[in-house]
Amino acid sequence: MAEKSSKKLWGGRFSGATDPLMAEFNKSIYSGKEMCEEDVIGSMAYAKALCQKNVISEEELNSILKGLEQIQREWNSGQFVLEPSDEDVHTANERRLTEIIGDVAGKLHTGRSRNDQVTTDLRLWLCRKIKEVEVYVINLLKVFTNRAEMEIDVIMSGYTHLQRAQPVRWSHFLMSHALPLLGDLGRLRQLYTRVSQLPLGAGALAGNPFNVDREFLRKELGFEGIIMNSMNAVGDRDFVIEFMFWAGMVMLHISRFAEDLIIYSSSEFGFVTLSDAYSTGSSIMPQKKNPDSLELLRGKSGRVLGDMIGLMITVKGTPTTYNKDLQEDKEPLFDAFKTVSDSLQILTGVVSTLTINPTKIAESLTPDLLATDLAEYLVRKGLPFRQTHHISGSAVRMAEERNTTLDKLSVSDLQSLHPLFDEDVSKVFNYEESVEKRCSIGGTAKHCVQEQIEHIRSAIL
């Protein structure tokens, strides 16, 4: 049965009924109720601003505030009852407020549009959620730094192109993934200020005709600033897209780390073992222990990036100010927030319970990883690096042709490649000394890795 338009907040203009499917299609109540707390808080502040301008009396203000407090309690206790006619959380709250206090509830919307109301709610919600997810990033960084500090003496093969490259500390590898997350933390903190800008008082698009005190509203709601153009205030969703970009970057960083751990946990590598708490088995192969937590983290990164791209495409063709297309911002935002929040917490659990296998890690260290060190040995004796690179490469080929390892070549073998090789060349084939030579800022020497750990710790205080 078609729903009468006259019952709608906007129904006075219409004489015909709304098509039932259109009525459902138009709703955003189930996604929008995520912001029920913010909607009530915003309405309380706006009611006070109206009272300041004598649009409503003190008595009416008190009645509205008491009604809103009851609505707040009903939402918090799960007792708020949604009606089929509720189009969104704003209309649901106004309908319930009217039931509680009568027609005076209709004064609350004076000078206010759902356009500035919804973006106020959304900004308040996102400000709260940014503070929440910030804690999850910090907790993950703490786990990374604690683990790196404890296991700083473990040396492994580093990889480029997924081929063994040079020795590095395990902790250096961990810090290579922690530092991008530290960058994410910085971006999140910068983003907060851009989200924390007041749109309320912008009206539908042209501003508020009752001269409400927007500075009062800013302070009352805890915003850091005020959006200075009313058209921009109601039509802007950059803050949503920017958060979703942030979430996408976090998930990208999580995905790359997850991929490394998936590889390192395989039988072929065996560097790490996941806790049972973050693994699953096979329904047919009893021996299997699958890194499902890591695979899901990798998979969900695509989901969050898809949320961001989808909203950007939705917004890109919309005309200036508010359009109904913008109703489609909430579901991808809420999904991206939940996914990135859950993922950060899951990864924190994975890293904190991970077991490293030092024997397997040590087996990845082979003399060919020190070919660059062999070239640098000759550099220290005065030869140009391009020449020493070629000589070291010839030594690698010689070892391969003799089916032996680089460290097994005799001094005379090496001297046949260049006379500057001497007995002290044996010192090259020491993995600990190799990593300690990489001692400039950002290197894999022990004190450099400790500096990286302290850099992160000082940033998350």
Curated annotation (Swiss-Prot):
Xref: PANTHER family: ARGININOSUCCINATE LYASE
The EC number(s) this enzyme carries: 4.3.2.1
Record-listed 2-(N(omega)-L-arginino)succinate binding positions: S28, N115, T160, N290, Y322, Q327, K330
Catalytic activity: 2-(N(omega)-L-arginino)succinate = fumarate + L-arginine
Signal peptide start and end residues: none
Active site: H161 (proton acceptor), S282 (proton donor)
Pathway(s) per entry: Amino-acid biosynthesis; L-arginine biosynthesis; L-arginine from L-ornithine and carbamoyl phosphate: step 3/3
Single GO biological process annotation from the record: urea cycle
Increases basicity of active site His, annotated site positions: E295
Annotated SUPFAM superfamilies: L-aspartase-like
Species for this entry: Schizosaccharomyces pombe (strain 972 / ATCC 24843) (Fission yeast)
Entry annotated with the keyword Electron transport: no
Family matches, as InterPro entries: Arg_succ_lyase_C (IPR029419), Argininosuccinate_lyase (IPR009049), Fumarase/histidase_N (IPR024083), Fumarate_lyase_CS (IPR020557), Fumarate_lyase_fam (IPR000362), Fumarate_lyase_N (IPR022761), L-Aspartase-like (IPR008948)
Source organism, top-level taxon: Eukaryota
UniProt keywords, alphabetically: Amino-acid biosynthesis, Arginine biosynthesis, Lyase
Xref: HAMAP family: Arg_succ_lyase
GO molecular function, one term: argininosuccinate lyase activity
Family statement drawn from the similarity comment of this UniProt entry: Belongs to the lyase 1 family. Argininosuccinate lyase subfamily.
Assembly mode: Homotetramer.
Protein name per the record: Argininosuccinate lyase
GO cellular component entries: cytosol
